[in-house]
Design a protein with these regions (language model features):
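Charged DNA-binding/catalytic regions of mobile-element recombinases
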Residues: 1-209
């Protein structure tokens, strides 16, 4: 049964940070706040778990990762990918200026994960256990992913047999979501376009008169 799958299981020996957002899912710039969570997809071979990291400013998915187990690597891999992606784009994250917000799942409170956040200079923020509103933006993204990608044949022509099928569909959906899906909250532009406009405005301000 789908209802029997729990993604938020608190760790007995984890490191529990406070909630720095208090349900305020807005940001003044890119890489001010990342929200993250993972969801699950049923395949013929078993459950697949898909983790996303979303930049709150433009609601852009900066990284994602799929796995067949709910270990710390499920959330560690996209974190490393997100940091690398920003550096590759010429906008590296700055120590002490980025908040990473998640639920209280054992993956996010593990010593290994919290130590890596500290290494990157990222401030951890964790909502309360069992309260979806404390990570409402990611709950919305997970819902869109299920509705637009998993429960349709738009991004995959048939049932999901293995993790490879999930990865194929997810990659296509993320590309569409970031670059072509129009958001009313962003003025009917895509997350990538909204973010690009922000950096273009900064570049214009820096140009000599």
């Amino acid at each position: 049964m789908l209802d029997s799958i729990r993604t938020t299981i608190p760790a007995k020996d984890g490191v529990r940070a406070g909630d720095l957002l208090n349900r305020d899912f807005t940001a003044p710039r890119p890489d001010h706040t990342w929200v993250t969570d993972f969801t699950y997809v049923r395949t013929w071979a078993g459950w697949v778990y898909v983790a996303f990291i979303l930049d709150v400013f433009a609601q852009r998915i900066v990284a994602w990762h799929a796995a067949t187990t709910k270990t710390t690597d499920l959330v560690m891999v996209p974190l490393r990918m997100a940091v690398w992606q920003r550096r590759h784009e010429g906008h590296p994250t700055a120590a002490g200026e980025l908040i990473h917000h998640s639920d209280a799942g054992s993956q996010y409170t593990s010593v290994r994960f919290t130590e890596h956040l500290e290494l990157e200079g990222i401030s951890p923020s964790i909502g309360s256990v069992g309260d979806a509103y404390d990570n409402a933006l990611m709950e919305t993204i997970n819902g869109l992913y299920k509705t637009e990608c998993i429960r349709t044949t738009v991004f995959h022509p048939g049932p999901f047999r293995t993790i490879a099928d999930v990865e194929y569909a997810t990659a296509a959906w993320v590309e569409w979501y970031n670059n072509r899906r129009l958001h009313s909250s962003l003025g009917m532009v895509s997350p990538t376009e909204y973010e690009h406009a922000h950096y273009s405005a900064i570049d214009r301000e820096r140009q000599p008169v």
